């Protein structure tokens, strides 16, 4: 197979940042953009008190609450590498959107708060990465505060997340005693100076830990560093590229994102060691990024990114070939040719038209309701990219319209918001009430807020007794019989798929027992 566009593909790095809320993910995102020259000034997010709002948090509700609830895509260049950074929602309730974002990246940066160590959301997200053997780099943040001992943090990561740690840098002190980091491979000592440009004072190369220059520079703290590194040499894992690429080992950096300290060391290692675009699985075969025909898939739909235009954008990951503006591609689900006339690339809310793009790049395609999450586009071959699921909701609310004249607008809003994949909508086989289902409770607030502000619809929620849902499939005759007998509990989702909503786990188990010829599914592939 001839390798097409090899140089451009090898320059691409497409990754996401994962963390527990408040570990500093948005701050790190901003600082990476700062080094990439994509922004001139970091818009610091002070927990829910932001006067300026972080560049990547552009939705109105995010601005009010100081949290990220949608995934943004940002592109920047660093040292001749083209970097696509996908910023994922930090809030617990948005794990479904985050999961889908992780299907579009080749590696991940995990951010850990040095004060708190590994937290629940990080654990959940790492399990998702492990399913796909995604390479993971780690940044332990907030060393400018008093936190847990660095060795204790490594042990926490290894035991809780079941992944080897390979420390790349090591902190000298923490909190008020934080002096900087020692690079275990380049033997460089980088001083922390919050007053200096980008928080970084001098970087001095020493001849190993016994260099008397260290005594001169660090004084009494030098012994602590020597003891730590001696312990590491016996207990820690040396960095191995193959183990990192297989998702078995994570290189670890220490720093303070709010002071921009440690970010450049991380970024330098990232561009050198993180993978370029990788092959992707379809239902029939794996597709190499170096194949000539263009292919890719949609992993996210975002409505109303530009309130002035009420637009909808499909976020599309290129997997092979080269995108050229105006090209015709085959929309596999619809079985028809479409022209992509005006694709864009993103810098949070800023968008620019793109003339060409390569595997690893994320482009935005204007969507008039025909593109759905999970859709595959190719230059003809009947391929379908896999692994972009819908999850069964765990929380449900009935939607009550406050103005009966707005029923059409309500339907449009609910269906469009469901197509973005953060919530799901269900319409009963008997009756007309809309039910919204979500993986997390915050999503209900988001839906109500966006219905009012983007679709001018005022509505209220009413409680319903459902606790879980399952998509149902089966042989036609059996399904018809099932529909007749269980009609009171059956709904169609936003895409017209049949779903069974259960008021208790017992009810679900009982129904499954009584209808063994019917298949009940907790997840559903998009499209």
From Swiss-Prot:
GO molecular function, one term: translation release factor activity, codon specific
Pfam family of the protein (one): EF-G_D2
Superkingdom of the source species: Bacteria
Domain tr-type G: 10-278
Swiss-Prot/TrEMBL GO biological process terms: regulation of translational termination
Protein name per the record: Peptide chain release factor 3
Alphabetized NCBIfam families for the sequence: prfC, PRK00741.1, small_GTP
A GO cellular component annotation in the UniProt record: cytosol
Residues reported in the UniProt entry to bind GTP: 19-26, 87-91, 141-144
Localization annotation: Cytoplasm
Family: Belongs to the TRAFAC class translation factor GTPase superfamily. Classic translation factor GTPase family. PrfC subfamily.
Classification via CDD domains: RF3 (cd04169), RF3_II (cd03689), RF3_III (cd16259)
Keyword Ribonucleoprotein: no
InterPro entries in alphabetical order: EF-G-like_DII, EFG_III/V, G_TR_CS, P-loop_NTPase, PrfC, RF3_C, RF3_dom_3_sf, RF3_GTP-bd
Alphabetical UniProt keywords: Cytoplasm, GTP-binding, Nucleotide-binding, Protein biosynthesis
Function of the molecule: Increases the formation of ribosomal termination complexes and stimulates activities of RF-1 and RF-2. It binds guanine nucleotides and has strong preference for UGA stop codons. It may interact directly with the ribosome. The stimulation of RF-1 and RF-2 is significantly reduced by GTP and GDP, but not by GMP.
